């Protein structure tokens, strides 16, 4: 190592952003800095004092990602038709306003805050507040239209969430409304209770156009669920949901893991193995390190906090090095692919222009013998992205023929005939269906670390691409909605529990 390289290695990372005081929610300056191989944050409120937290658990990985993917090339352009004006400034004017730098890639609509469970970690406050938020059928249709009217990208991926969305009997009709409005990908975020018990209702969701089931799945030990969900009978229910999915012909399930230190951080390897064993129906594992919103108590934060690189290291250990920390890329890695495909196909593709520290992902390819390897062993993913940047720059310079010729450089980078064939289909057709065929032959593992008031970073939130549509005609970034806006928005459209029970004559947990 040269003296110059050594000096670069010794440089400690430091930058500044804006955060929130966890007590009063006023904006405060935030310092992000490196110490002992970890990236920390610190912020001070004039009234409530100093707060510190872990920002990113691996400084080496952080600096690599920051250098490669935190730059202007990966910035979005926001909405051409913003829904609100700037009055108080970000994050109080959501949304989306002109300060937001990305458009909606995944829209979320909470169809109820009622639930048939009472999970202590739920950020949607299901069953914990004394009101019922349940938008009307027409309000939900209007929210779908709101997302579809976004420009330059009409949101075509939608999640129905809650609460527990499956306790609405009209959910199949709402899915059909989304498909009618032109949404290509519709997923349902669920604990699976009703789908394990009522296969006919499950099939109605599929027949209506549901693309994917977003299944709460914290592990394969009942002790986990006692801590995270307050029940000890859920493992068999998860198995039953997969069994019913096979019976009705659904082959796209995402296992959604709420990850907490000391609870299920030793279970990631077994969850990956379970996904591999069930890869005929499991398409993805989405790991969500716990955020301190909802009913997760403040005094539990320190012992339960776990960051994206902590999760990556645990997976490396628990897969015996099959998936290393260098097999992951930040969630904005696909930007050049969207841009390159756009100039070649002369159409707009969704751009994942979120902040690179919001999450990370990798893909694993399952072999016939049940073994698996990360896609980085089959494809030079960084060269792949570099070629797509070259394709994009050729296209925007008007050299469309050259851009198309550069596409020929992509497939020789792929070692596996299976993966090469799948990618060829995606590259040549550039369709949602081709991408779906690719996703059905691999398993994605994603880690999304949603923010709370303790680790809130304005720089991150302004680049968010996962947005809630709400009945007031606004679209709000995920982390501002759950940290700041949820209660006030829901209360505008809520009725009291007593009013609801008098109107319907049922328990809050019962389907209506």
Q: What is the predicted role of each segment?
A:
Residues 141-159, 168-289:
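Radical SAM/AdoMet-radical enzyme domain recognition
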Residues 40, 106, 212, 254, ...:
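Broad gene-expression machinery/nucleic-acid interaction feature
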Residues 109-111, 123-126, 162, 190, ...:
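Glycine-rich, histidine-containing beta strand-loop boundary motifs that form or position
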Residues 126-134, 227-233, 300-301:
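Short glycine-enriched, charge-decorated loop/helix-capping segments at active-site entrances
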Residues 247-433, 437:
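Radical SAM enzyme [4Fe-4S]-AdoMet core and its adjacent flexible, acidic
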Residues 1-87, 93-95, 346-512:
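Radical SAM enzyme core and accessory elements
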Residues 37-62, 66-190, 194-200, 204, ...:
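Conserved alpha-helical substructure of the radical SAM core
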Residues 125-130, 220-223, 292-293:
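A short, flexible beta-alpha/helix-coil linker loop
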């Amino acid at each position: 190592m040269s003296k110059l390289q050594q000096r670069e290695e010794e440089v400690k990372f430091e930058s500044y952003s804006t955060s929130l005081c966890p007590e009063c929610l006023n904006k405060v300056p935030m310092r992000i800095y490196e110490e002992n191989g970890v990236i920390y944050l610190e912020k001070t409120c004039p009234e409530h004092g100093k707060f510190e937290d872990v920002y990113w658990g691996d400084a080496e990985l952080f600096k690599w990602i920051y250098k490669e993917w935190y730059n202007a090339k990966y910035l979005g352009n926001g909405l051409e038709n913003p829904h609100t004006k700037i009055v108080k400034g970000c994050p109080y004017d959501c949304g989306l306003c002109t300060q937001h730098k990305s458009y909606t890639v995944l829209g979320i609509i909470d169809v109820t805050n009622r639930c048939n469970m009472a999970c202590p970690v739920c950020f949607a406050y299901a069953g914990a507040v004394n009101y019922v938020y349940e938008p009307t059928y027409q309000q939900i249709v209007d929210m779908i239209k709101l997302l579809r009217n976004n420009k330059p990208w009409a949101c075509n991926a939608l999640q129905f969430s809650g609460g527990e969305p499956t306790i609405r009997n009209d959910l199949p009709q709402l899915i059909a409304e989304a498909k009618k409005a032109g949404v290509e990908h519709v997923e349902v975020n669920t604990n699976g209770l009703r789908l394990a018990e009522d296969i006919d209702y499950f099939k109605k969701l599929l027949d209506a156009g549901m693309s994917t089931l977003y299944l709460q799945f914290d592990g394969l030990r009942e002790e986990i669920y006692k801590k995270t969900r307050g029940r000890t009978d859920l493992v068999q229910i998860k198995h039953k949901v997969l069994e019913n999915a096979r019976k009705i012909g659904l082959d796209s399930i995402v296992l959604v893991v709420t990850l907490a230190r000391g609870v299920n951080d030793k279970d990631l390897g077994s969850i990956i193995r379970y996904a591999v064993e069930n890869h005929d129906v499991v398409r993805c594992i989405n790991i969500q390190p716990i955020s301190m919103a909802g009913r997760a108590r403040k005094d539990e934060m320190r012992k339960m906090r776990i960051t994206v690189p902590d999760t990556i290291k645990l997976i490396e250990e628990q897969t015996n090095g099959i998936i290393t920390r260098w097999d992951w890329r930040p969630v904005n890695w696909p930007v050049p692919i969207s841009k390159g495909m756009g100039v070649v196909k002369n159409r707009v593709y969704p751009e994942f222009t979120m902040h690179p520290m919001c999450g990370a992902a990798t893909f694993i390819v399952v072999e016939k013998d049940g073994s698996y390897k990360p896609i980085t062993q089959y494809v030079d993913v960084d060269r792949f992205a570099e070629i797509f940047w070259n394709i994009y720059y050729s296209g925007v310079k008007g050299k469309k023929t050259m851009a198309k010729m550069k596409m020929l450089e992509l497939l020789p980078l792929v070692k596996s005939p299976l993966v090469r064939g799948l990618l060829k289909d995606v590259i040549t057709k550039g369709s949602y269906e081709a991408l779906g065929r690719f996703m059905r032959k691999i398993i994605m593992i994603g880690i999304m670390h949603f923010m709370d008031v303790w680790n809130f970073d304005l720089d991150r939130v302004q680049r968010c691409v996962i947005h809630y549509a709400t009945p007031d005609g606004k679209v709000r970034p995920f982390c501002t909605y759950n940290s700041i806006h949820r209660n006030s928005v829901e209360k505008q459209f809520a009725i009291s529990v007593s009013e609801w029970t008098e109107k319907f004559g049922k328990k809050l947990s019962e389907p209506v």
